[in-house]
């Protein structure tokens, strides 16, 4: 990709357009970090929103349906307790209530009705993420979905399916180098085809809580699939602040950032190394591989 300014693939300032307005104790609107508006080549829509109490109204996300696969994830804001969410939530899938209190991800196949989301308990701040796959247009996804239309009754399950098959409550740990310090080891895999056979996506994440060593520890590498690389801070009072300063080299071009960022990596574009220049607060690093469902398919079974 000669003469490409790879900065066009980095989003360091979110849009505020999705996820409703006027909801108390929740970022409202949510932070949009990937869309066709932000990166025209990326047919994905990614939002993040801090939850800082029981949302009001509760529920504020109602049963809805759309024509695209979606990954929904709720993660702990505490790097010392990454698996304990800090809340108890009920999420309806296909009319079946799914209760959880750990960092949890959901794969929602296109056409599956989902919602409402109901908070039962709140202990500490946590993050809600939605990643819609195959469409980067907010209105096409949610415009007629019914997401913001209150329903009189709770949904009823009508299919003979246990929708727990689309839920990941505990991660796999298969990536990382035990000799690297300052970050979660192993990283936490919260989406793969091994965990959910229908999900041809691979999502893994790690907390960075001090300057990693060695630095860099992620070298240049390349995949035969698209990827989103996400770095997110841990401070709900300053939600766009990363808490660090990082440089990621994309296509040979250094991209440096100190705020949250989402970087779209097109198929076949070399990326890395990643070098940390500061770590002021803990922050989360997430890699989302799109169109592959296993570690071996993404990295050939070898760490970059």
Regions found by a protein language model. Give the residues of each.
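Double-stranded beta-helix
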Residues: 1-19, 117-174, 274-304
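Short intrinsically disordered coil segments
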Residues: 63-64, 88-90, 144-150, 220-221, ...
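Conserved metal-binding segment of the jelly-roll/cupin
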Residues: 93-120, 252-277
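Solvent-exposed interaction surfaces and binding hotspots enriched for charged
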Residues: 98-100, 170, 175-177, 193, ...
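Extracellular structured ligand-interaction cores
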Residues: 68-72, 86-88, 126-128, 200, ...
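A short glycine-rich, His/Asp/Glu-containing loop-to-beta-strand
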Residues: 26-70, 181-227
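A short beta-strand-loop-beta hairpin characteristic of the jelly-roll/cupin
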Residues: 74-101, 139-142, 231-258, 298-299
